[in-house]
Amino acid sequence: MVVVSATMYFPQQARAIMQQVPVEYQPQSEWDTMRQRHKLGDDQIVALWEWQRGMKDSHDDMSFTPPSLARITASTLIIYGDRDFLYPIEMAIEMYRAIPHSALWVVPNGGHGPIFRDAVPQFVKIALDFFSK
């Protein structure tokens, strides 16, 4: 298993952040990345972010706590950017400590969703190494 997002681990915090971060406050690097991926322009990007903000109410049944994370039996790779502007790194560390047979990869200079940007080659290598064990 690869844990890419921790929003379900802290649903209240995730909802609050999704509601508070207006599109215009997204970092320029995020806009640049989105513009490379979504060729229909800024209207498409804004619509995607608004759709994501709409997910804020969809995590009620997925509040993972350390005791529930401890029941995960699959080997789990947790990936986290050390410069995530939305969630503190302590979240990833707590998940790593709670999930048996887990590994934590902290992406240097990685923001929110670091494997979708410059870290793709490293992600592929680390994930393949992880799954080969």
Where are these regions (language model features)?
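Short beta-strand/loop motif that positions the catalytic acidic residue
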Residues: 72, 78-80
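Short alpha-helix in the alpha/beta-hydrolase fold that links the catalytic acid
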Residues: 74, 88-97
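Catalytic active-site module of serine/aspartate enzymes centered on a nucleophile-bearing elbow/loop
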Residues: 102-133
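Active-site nucleophile elbow and catalytic-triad environment of alpha/beta-hydrolase enzymes
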Residues: 51-68
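Short aromatic-enriched loop/helix-cap "lid" or pocket-rim segments at secondary-structure transitions
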Residues: 13-17, 91, 117-120
